């Protein structure tokens, strides 16, 4: 079982867009799951009108009206990133989308910068709901590291609380990965890769949620997005080790800063 206290402080990136209540409601759900303290971050002036809007939203969602609100000035994304650093936020929650073109949801600028420049965990919702829908299917992109193992434990913890149907643990293998492995004399059969991935999962011990391992092959890392859509996943989970590449996305997953196939949880 994972230690939910890893997320002692959760904050929601606040705007007064038509979907603000929905994003705040999703954040409340996550707060309840992890037993965390929830605060709000707002880039703008602390006026009576703004305070009344926050008070109304908190009241509508049965959240404490004395919840902390961290005010910042300037560029929205930069302000949110400053507040995260200043107040030691463990997990930031935000709406993901700016627009949708040809059925591909494109990340908004704030969400993109939180994912790209942030040093904490990020959870982005593509279609937040006032009454949050259960997260039935998870896809976890695995790497073989202690950080990824801890991230998978945390993922399974949330999946169990959500009474999820299945967690897919996948390993993305691109054509470039295979060519590099062959050059280094590390080529292996698909069955070997799946056995290694299965062992990675089994090493966690007792698992309360149905779990399935898959090795996904393709020309680029975008094959992961195709898989997410094929299984109709509700949450894509990506472990980003702060000790590697400063916790940034690996090259084969950089497409996530542009296109997001479903709700996304980046665990740092």
Where are these regions (language model features)?
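Structural beta-alpha unit
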Residues: 1-5, 45-48, 59-92, 99-100, ...
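Small/aliphatic-rich secondary-structure junction motif
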Residues: 2-53, 59, 63, 137-183, ...
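Amphipathic coiled-coil/heptad-repeat helices and related helical stalk/stem segments
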Residues: 23, 76-77, 107, 151, ...
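Short, hinge-like loop/turn segments at secondary-structure boundaries
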Residues: 56-59, 110-111, 140-142, 185-188, ...
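Gly/Ser-rich helix-loop-strand patches that form or flank binding pockets
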Residues: 81-131, 226-268
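Conserved N-terminal glycine/acidic-rich loop preference
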Residues: 133, 150, 196
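Structured core of small recognition/catalytic domains
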Residues: 165-235, 247, 252
């Amino acid at each position: 079982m994972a230690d939910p206290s890893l997320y002692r402080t959760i904050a929601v990136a606040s705007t007064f867009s038509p979907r603000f209540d929905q994003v705040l409601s999703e954040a409340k759900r996550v707060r309840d799951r992890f037993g965390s303290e929830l605060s709000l971050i707002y880039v703008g002036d602390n006026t009576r009108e703004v305070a009344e809007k926050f008070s109304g939203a908190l009241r509508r969602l049965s959240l404490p009206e004395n919840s902390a609100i961290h005010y910042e000035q300037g560029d929205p994304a930069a302000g949110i990133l400053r507040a995260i650093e200043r107040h030691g936020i463990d997990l930031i929650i935000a709406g993901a989308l700016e627009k949708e073109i040809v059925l591909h949801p494109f990340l908004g600028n704030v969400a993109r910068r939180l994912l790209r420049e942030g040093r904490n965990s990020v959870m982005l919702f593509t279609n937040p709901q006032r009454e949050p829908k259960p997260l039935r299917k998870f896809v976890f992109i695995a790497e073989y590291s202690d950080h990824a193992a801890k991230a998978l434990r945390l993922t399974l913890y949330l999946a169990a609380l959500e009474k999820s149907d299945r967690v897919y643990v996948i390993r993305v293998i691109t054509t470039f990965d295979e060519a590099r492995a062959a050059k280094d004399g590390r080529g292996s059969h698909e069955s070997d890769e799946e056995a290694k991935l299965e062992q990675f999962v089994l090493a966690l011990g007792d698992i309360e949620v149905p779990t399935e391992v898959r090795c996904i092959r393709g020309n680029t890392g975008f094959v992961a997005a195709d898989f997410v859509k094929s299984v109709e996943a509700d949450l894509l989970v990506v472990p980003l080790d702060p000790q590697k590449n400063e916790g940034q996305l690996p090259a084969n997953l950089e497409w996530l800063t542009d296109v997001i196939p479903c709700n996304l949880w980046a665990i740092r």
